[in-house]
């Protein structure tokens, strides 16, 4: 895979069966780790796996025109393994159909990378904060310090 990524996308999803609500979020960076945009959304009547998948699908859908080399970073082994084809797709087939349809319309080369959740990875933590924020927790103040952030050459 080409290590000169056009975009690096960090994603996260969360779901509480107790409250029957959850959220998903992504943070999109350019290949030099400069902030491009973020997105988060509340969902209901879903599952944690669906939240994780929706985060990745939303990010891929919102890639700017001309993108080719993409890195997707997630703490969901389920999402990464099913989307990359390392694991069979037995559930959530509607979401896989959407993902496959998006990919069929573009010439993306996607690398999938797993990161341990809640391990201090700044962008994974930021996605987690965005998920919490959309559910009513205040993560906006925390996000402001990351806006425009550039990390020199580290990926």
Task: Describe the residue ranges of each PLM region.
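Structural motif
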Residues: 1-2, 105
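RNase H-like nuclease fold core
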Residues: 2-50, 61-63, 68, 155
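RNase H catalytic domain
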Residues: 11-20, 57-130, 134-147
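Short, conserved alpha-helix that lines the donor NDP-sugar binding/gating region
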Residues: 52, 56
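Short acidic DE-rich linear segments
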Residues: 149-155
């Amino acid at each position: 895979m080409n290590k000169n990524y056009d975009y690096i996308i960090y994603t996260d999803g969360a779901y509480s069966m107790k409250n029957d609500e959850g959220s998903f979020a992504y943070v999109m960076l350019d290949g030099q780790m400069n902030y491009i945009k973020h997105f988060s959304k509340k969902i209901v009547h879903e599952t944690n796996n669906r939240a994780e998948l929706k985060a990745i699908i939303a990010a891929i859908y919102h890639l700017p025109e001309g993108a080719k080399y993409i890195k997707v970073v997630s703490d969901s082994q389920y999402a990464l393994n099913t989307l990359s084809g390392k694991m069979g797709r037995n559930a959530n087939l509607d979401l896989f159909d959407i993902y496959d349809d998006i990919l069929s319309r573009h010439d993306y080369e996607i690398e999938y990378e797993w990161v341990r959740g809640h391990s201090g990875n700044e962008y994974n933590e930021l996605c987690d904060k965005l998920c919490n924020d959309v559910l009513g927790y205040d993560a906006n103040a925390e996000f402001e310090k990351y806006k425009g952030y550039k990390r020199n050459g580290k990926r």
